[in-house]
Amino acid sequence: ETSATSDGIHLLAPENLQLNDKWVLKDGELYPSEKPGGILWSKEKFGDFKISLEYKTSTKANSGLFFRTNPKNPVQEGFEIQIASAGLYSGKHILGSLYDAERAAVEAGKPDGEWNTMTLTCKGPMIKATVNGQTTVDVNIDDWTEGNKNPDGSVNKFKTPLKDLPREGHFGLQYHGQQVWFRDVLVKRL
């Protein structure tokens, strides 16, 4: 399998990832090594795109899909769609949420140990995510006009208004203490 096809770019290929000893890429699956940690970044930046992937979680797992992100400061200079065990969190931190900014409209995750599908489409200010075919987030990032504040008035951790963050950046797959697996990560530029 080549890393680029007419369908897009296969992100889980050594030439497309900044691989390190904290992650294992084997037989098309990516998972944390015995000494796991941190976020694994794409080599390239992406602006407008559609990414699709499959993931599965272990018990009480917390992970995330970072996008349009600066790897040097991912929390403040980028975006994350939350990946987590179903029912583990509440509010704007549940599975499928735009982390700390927009609560997922539906919690669509399968039980730990089962493969889930996720898609994320970004075009200009529009961000749409699905989990297992159900739309979790569909927002216009230009609505986030103040630092540390969501459009609904709730507080977030982002010092910069989300509308002012770059519209291009790296993808990151997060390890946050519990096993998580990824496969079939395909990106198409729009």
Model-derived segments and spans:
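Carbohydrate-interacting regions of secretory-pathway proteins
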Residues: 1-190
